[in-house]
Amino acid sequence: MAARRIADEPAYVLHSYDWSDSSLILETFTRHYGRVALVAKGAKKPTSNFRPVLLPLQPLRVTYTLGGEGHGEIHALKGAEWAGGHVMPTGDALLSGLYLNELLLRLLAREDTHAPLFDTYAGVVRVLATVDHEGEHGDALEPVLRSFELLLLREIGLLPGLDAETSTLAPLHAAARYALVPEAGLRPALSADRAALSGGQWLALQGALDEPARYTATLRAIATAEAPVAADLKTQLRALLQYHCGSPLLRTRQLMMDLQKL
């Protein structure tokens, strides 16, 4: 029986590692099939057509056959083409993109479809590609990253509702302060909390997440808030993400901390 073939599938390479002297295992994020592991035979050879194409943060179209008996979740890459559209991000934008890739690797189950999240990721990568070494458009990075973190957590069911206290379901008061903490969800802020947002800010974020075009709406809510929310939101979302990722610390986050970029 012929192996099932998946053709012309939109995809991004999240990570790659050696499989043999000449081949690679690719962890990819595909639009219709989620996170998929592919073996790219001969990809390390200088003459391989795969070699210049299988790069992170680049839109691809891949063709592969499903792994047969004994191959489990690893499938055979048969073709890959650059889908075009933008250049490779650099500098802080590149590190940010690799951070998003690590989140997807740590939090997404293999072959669990997340088409809306794929579209959000593709949009974020396009923004990252516009940030140059001198930091042009760099002010867009924070809202974009925070939006993706929120949407990722929501997509995989790890984000509590942002319109009520998690433990009591009491509605939020617009002027009160609330903190999002890993063990308890959203609760009234304490003096010891490193970061918190007002009830009105959390409600605005929940409203954006409920919009049909949730990525655009969430990005707008963060970027245009009357009081800056990105910094306090970063502290809370990073703690929640690390809690669900478990140990060790995210490698890209540690690298950015070492470079004093976080």
Swiss-Prot record:
Any one Gene Ontology BP term: double-strand break repair
Function: Involved in DNA repair and RecF pathway recombination.
Family in the record: Belongs to the RecO family.
Pfam families: RecO_C, RecO_N
N-terminal signal peptide: none
Keyword Membrane: no
Originating gene: recO
Name by which UniProt lists this protein: DNA repair protein RecO
HAMAP family tied to this protein: RecO
Keywords: DNA damage, DNA recombination, DNA repair
Species of the source: Acidovorax ebreus (strain TPSY) (Diaphorobacter sp. (strain TPSY))
GO CC list: bacterial nucleoid
